[in-house]
Curated annotation (Swiss-Prot):
Protein's UniProt name: GTPase Obg
GO biological process: ribosome biogenesis
NCBIfam families: Obg_CgtA, Obg_CgtA_exten, PRK12296.1, PRK12297.1, PRK12299.1, small_GTP
Cofactor(s) demanded: Mg(2+)
Species the sequence originates in: Caldanaerobacter subterraneus subsp. tengcongensis (strain DSM 15242 / JCM 11007 / NBRC 100824 / MB4) (Thermoanaerobacter tengcongensis)
Subunit field text: Monomer.
Record domain OBG-type G: where: 160-330
Gene: obg
CDD domains: Obg
Length: 424
């Protein structure tokens, strides 16, 4: 299966259904009154962590996800049906990010954990809701609220106990294959591994998940080589096994290799160099490996790290390496995953309301997000709806703002080229 660990998708919550305008008309009921029902709520957009998924491949082919709209209200005070919620399945370990602001919306690290990212628009009220002792036959209803929309970025960070790090061709994939049933592509050239591989290691009655991270090079923290594409997969690991080609088969100095990789980890995220780390001096089956190992061991121990001479190819030294790995993992306190909320509810920041006023004679031209928001639920062509709009203008403080500019009763208000005289 193709491994995809990033995606950018468009999501939209469902629109609320419109309120309905109707009047009860039945024999022997001469004054039936309004009976228009409310519109249904739009569907939410909900992400759910599915343990059966391991890649974001599906989002390569489909990038727009829109929840169902609520149904319009009906006569006889019947409410419209709510829109179906839209569930989007992602692998466990997926981070959902607001693409515009970079804000982390949710981090789904527990199987079946949910994140309600966008809530559906509210249904509009039917005309029955607007009946008052002074307005017995309202001939208007509210339009449904539009569902919010946004672009989000999905980033998958693998959930593994142990991360294998090192230069390309150091032998990480061979080590993973020797320790587990994973079968990563193995060849004698750099960057054979282009995607992370996971394997379950079973050793002396214990088991853990090991991740083979594609080889790093100098500048990886800046995105060079495979860079940021895969460094993030180390973030969730509990410890690192630093695999070094101690034979220097690529013409590099093993000690310098060790230093450079740790520096890249530090530059990417300081926390990574604080993770428990042991060093696997690989390719001890080669004469050059045996020759260079004593100096390498001395230098690495000076830096405070434990070194284990191994051959990933012949499996020499693997028992001691895995014994130490299990010892370290057993000493790390288990994460309190039960404290992770089952459902995350995201509340996107509200857009700042704006009101623009242009005065020409006794006509006041209004525009801006504040007016747009009020108009979403108004039918300006209906007299009763227009009266309700005037009430909203007062309640929202727009009329007070106009009075500061000299507005008075009898002046004209213009919104979207529709004009009406306002009287108090």
């Amino acid at each position: 299966m193709v491994f995809i660990d990033t995606a950018r998708i468009y999501i939209k919550a469902g629109d609320g259904g419109n309120g309905f305008i109707s009047f009860r008309r039945e024999k022997y009921v001469p004054y039936g009154g309004p009976d228009g029902g409310d519109g249904g709520k739009g569907g939410d957009v909900i992400f759910i962590a599915d343990p059966n998924l391991s890649t974001l491949l599906d989002f390569k082919y489909k990038r727009k996800y829109i929840a169902e709209n609520g149904e319009n209200g009906k006569s006889k005070n019947q409410y419209g049906k709510d829109g179906e919620d839209l569930y989007i399945k992602v692998p466990v370990g997926t981070t959902i990010i607001n693409d515009e602001t970079g804000e982390v919306i949710a981090d789904l690290i527990k199987p079946y954990q949910k994140a309600i990212v966008l809530k559906g628009g509210k249904g509009g009220r039917g005309n029955a809701k607007f009946a008052t002792p002074t307005l017995k036959t309202p001939r208007f209803a509210e339009s449904g609220e539009k569902g919010r929309e946004m672009w989000v970025r999905l980033e998958l960070k693998l959930l593994a106990d142990v991360g294998l790090v090192g230069f390309p061709n150091a032998g990480k994939s061979t080590l993973l294959a020797s320790c587990s049933r994973a079968r990563p592509k193995i060849a004698n050239y750099p960057f054979t591994t282009l995607t992370p591989n996971l394997g379950v290691v079973e050793h002396k009655g214990k088991s853990f998940v090991m991740a083979d991270i594609p080889g790093l090079i100098e500048g990886a923290h800046r995105g060079e080589g495979l860079g940021h594409d895969f460094l993030r997969h180390i973030e969730r690991t509990k410890m690192l096994i630093h695999v070094v080609d101690v034979s220097g088969s690529e013409g590099r100095d093993p000690v310098e290799d060790f230093e450079k990789i740790n520096e890249e980890l530090r530059l990417y995220d300081e926390r990574l160099v604080t993770l428990p780390q042991i060093v696997a001096a690989n390719k001890m089956d080669l004469p050059e490996g045996k020759e260079k190992y004593p100096r390498f061991e001395e230098e690495i121990k000076k830096r405070g790290y434990e070194v284990y001479p191994i051959s990933a190819l012949t499996k020499e030294g693997l028992d001691a390496l895995l014994d130490k790995t299990i010892e370290i993992l057993s000493s790390i306190p288990a994460e309190k995953i039960e404290e992770v909320p089952e459902v995350i509810v995201y509340n996107p920041p509200e857009e700042e309301e704006t009101l623009e006023v242009e005065v020409k004679g006794n006509t006041y031209y209004l525009k801006g997000s504040k007016i747009d928001k009020l108009l979403k639920r108004i039918n300006l062509q209906d007299e009763h709806s227009l009266r309700y709009f005037e009430i909203l203008l007062r309640k929202s403080g727009v009329i007070d703002a106009l009075k500061e500019k000299g507005f008075k009763s009898g002046d004209v208000i213009n919104v979207r080229d529709f004009e009406f005289e306002y009287y108090e």
